[in-house]
Structure formats: structure tokens, C-alpha cells
Amino acid sequence: MTQPIVVAALYKFVTLEDYVNLREPLLQAMVDNGIKGTLLIAEEGINGTVSGSREGIDGLLAWLRNDPRMVDIDHKESYCDEQPFYRTKVKLKKEIVTLGVEGVDPNKKVGTYVEPKDWNALISDPEVLLIDTRNDYEVSIGTFEGAIDPKTTSFREFPDYIKEHFDPAVHKKVAMFCTGGIRCEKASSYMLGEGFEEVYHLKGGILKYLEEVPQEETKWQGDCFVFDNRVTVRHDLSEGDYDQCHACRTPVSVEDRASEHYVAGISCPHCWDTLSEKTRRSAIDRQKQIELAKARNMPHPIGYNYKQASTEA
């Protein structure tokens, strides 16, 4: 029986002054263990989602944890039948998740971590302001009951949204969440710096919550967007029914794919009347490459660009 592929989302805020020198040995460790996916490293830490065999993932985690600075690196796992990534990359970054505000450092100041088992009680408190720190296309797939959607298109927009809508003197308790924990952890550091006193964030993010909290007790509604070719996962962490439009990158549902405006790899109901001719031509060419690669039983030569550049778990 074929063993399922293990998908591991991992991150840790930790000072890595030698991060530039870490790139090549980390990349070699990924190659040696047969790992696909992308890891981002910066002076503030490491972040990314990777996939491989059980032995391969364990080997990579052992390599990382051999460094005393990463012995407690956070990671969440799920499984799939097909390889969700086509390439193996380690990228050097200024930030492992881009907020774009100087001085925000979760290594120095961070909110209160909340375990998944305690999350329901916290967000049931009427005095708690619950904010989804993810982008609009992610929130549209699923979110927690009662969560505020900032309707941001990138994490860089989050600080301005907070300044325009909330006041530390009025909003005394704030709880935030994201896919794997990294965005809300950095957001908590930012909000503490802005004067918010009680700031909480979901430890391990939505993925850890779905893993640990039974469906009969859940306050989660819908699927969870993930940054790989699965597009979404259900509450049991199995692959969801969404695809993703290669032209506009929006997740598309079963209903969307039944629309007359949906053309696989080229357009969807969300973008069919707004695409530039250049984007449309590019999508058509990319789809031809994908179909040719599939016919030859080869990985897509340029990969699916599933907004992975952000890798914002």
C-alpha cells in the first residue's frame, strides 16, 4: 500500500544572525531527505510548508532540531495522496512573514498563546474582539464564528486596518488567529506595540485547532485555505473540494467550476470580465504547459504559482 505524503507546516521566530550561511546546508538537508516545498529564512526566524515521506519529514525536523535555537520549532502535519509541491527551495528574506513595520519583533514581545483546547472558551467571551488576520480570499473559504474579516489583500495592509478601526482604550481584549500561527503571532507583537493590553493568539493556528478539537465541539465554519496544491483542507484535514484559478489565484468551489465563465486554468467567475489580455494569454500558455506535462507524466515545468510567494502560514 502506498504511504501518504506528509505535509508539514513549520515556523519559529528566533534570532538567526547567520541565516545567510544557513541557506545551503538547509537546502542540502531538504534534498537529502527527499523534501519538496519552500522554506523562508530571515534574521527573525524560519517559516514554510514542505512535504515528503514520513521518514523524510522526520529527517528534516531532526536536522532542524539539532540546532539548539530550533529544538522546539512549531510544526503541524496533514496528509495527501499526491505531491503538493514540485520544487525544493530555501529563500532568504527580510521577514519570514511580511508585515512591513519596522521594530516589530516577536522574539522580544508577543501576545498570550492560547492552546486549541482553550480557544472556544476565549472567543465565547463577549468582551473579546476576534480578528481573522488572513487575507480576504482565505477568509471567504472559512473562518471562526463571530470573527471580524479585515478584507485585506496582503498582510502589509493589516496595520493600517487596525489603526483605522480599533482603539486600545476601547478594545481591551483582542484574540487573533491565522492558518498556522505565524501571522497572528507577529500581529500580536505589533498590537502590543500599539498599546493594546490583552492580546491573545491561537497557538498552532487553525490547522492545530482542526487537528485537536473534535468536530462536534468546533466553532470553525467552512474549509481552511492552505498554501499548496490541495488549496483547502476540511475539518478532518482531508483535502477539500476547492481548486484555484491560475489567472486570479482565487479559490474556486464546485459551484464556481460549473459556471459558464469557468475555463480550467484560464478564468473563473471571479475574474472572467476583469482579466487583462496579457494575463489571459499567460494563463492560456501556462495551462497548455500543464496539460503537456500531465500527458508526459511529468511535474509541471514551472509549477503552480499558488500565491506561494507569501508562504504565510
From Swiss-Prot:
<keyword id="KW-0819">tRNA processing</keyword>
<feature type="domain" description="Rhodanese">
    <location>
        <begin position="124"/>
        <end position="218"/>
    </location>
</feature>
<dbReference type="GO" id="GO:0006400">
    <property type="term" value="P:tRNA modification"/>
</dbReference>
<comment type="similarity">
    <text>Belongs to the TrhO family.</text>
</comment>
<comment type="function">
    <text>Catalyzes oxygen-dependent 5-hydroxyuridine (ho5U) modification at position 34 in tRNAs.</text>
</comment>
<dbReference type="Pfam" id="PF00581">
    <property type="entry name" value="Rhodanese"/>
</dbReference>
<dbReference type="InterPro" id="IPR040503">
    <property type="entry name" value="TRHO_N"/>
</dbReference>
<dbReference type="InterPro" id="IPR001763">
    <property type="entry name" value="Rhodanese-like_dom"/>
</dbReference>
<feature type="active site" description="Cysteine persulfide intermediate">
    <location>
        <position position="178"/>
    </location>
</feature>
<dbReference type="Pfam" id="PF17773">
    <property type="entry name" value="UPF0176_N"/>
</dbReference>
<protein>
    <recommendedName>
        <fullName>tRNA uridine(34) hydroxylase</fullName>
        <ecNumber>1.14.-.-</ecNumber>
    </recommendedName>
</protein>
<dbReference type="GO" id="GO:0016705">
    <property type="term" value="F:oxidoreductase activity, acting on paired donors, with incorporation or reduction of molecular oxygen"/>
</dbReference>
<dbReference type="InterPro" id="IPR020936">
    <property type="entry name" value="TrhO"/>
</dbReference>
<keyword id="KW-0560">Oxidoreductase</keyword>
<dbReference type="InterPro" id="IPR036873">
    <property type="entry name" value="Rhodanese-like_dom_sf"/>
</dbReference>
